[in-house]
Amino acid sequence: MTVEPMVFVVDDDRSVRRSVVRLLETAGLLVEGFPSAEAFLERERPDGPGCVVLDVRMPGISGLELQRRLTAAGWSTPVVFITGHGDVPMSVEAMKDGAVDFLLKPFDDESLLAAIDRAIARDRALLRDRLQLEELRVRYD
């Protein structure tokens, strides 16, 4: 049985968040939107594959800070950044911290969907590798 991937959209701009959620739902993905990093952090950690679409600049906890917190907490869910205020150093920082992509607003739908597909594929591979490693540990312990 295959678990359907979940995409989390975290953006303080309601119109952008709603637009991205609608696009992803239309593409057949399971989606959950959040108006802030704080709201997202209140959610339980996902069990299955997926990714997080993050706005870089948000009030309170920024997207970059949220990415760091997720990594520190052991979340391996891949991140796709979206921003209207990106620059090269910011995108380099995000990519070094493990982001799959860094898209500037306005972005085209195909670019976002392709980035999400890559992120989900990466997460599925990581989850599969972890499961195989755990099976080996059980077998040889």
Predicted regions and their residues:
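C-terminal output helix
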Residues: 87-89, 103, 107-117
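Acidic catalytic/metal-coordinating carboxylates
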Residues: 35-36, 61-68, 86
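Active-site beta3 strand of CheY-like receiver
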Residues: 8, 47-53
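Receiver (REC) domain active-site loop signature in two-component systems and cognate sites
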Residues: 58
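Active-site residues of response regulator receiver
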Residues: 55, 83
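Short amphipathic alpha-helix used as the core "switch/output" element in two-component signaling
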Residues: 42, 64-75, 93, 97
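Two-component/phosphorelay signaling modules centered on CheY-like receiver
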Residues: 2-5, 13-32, 72
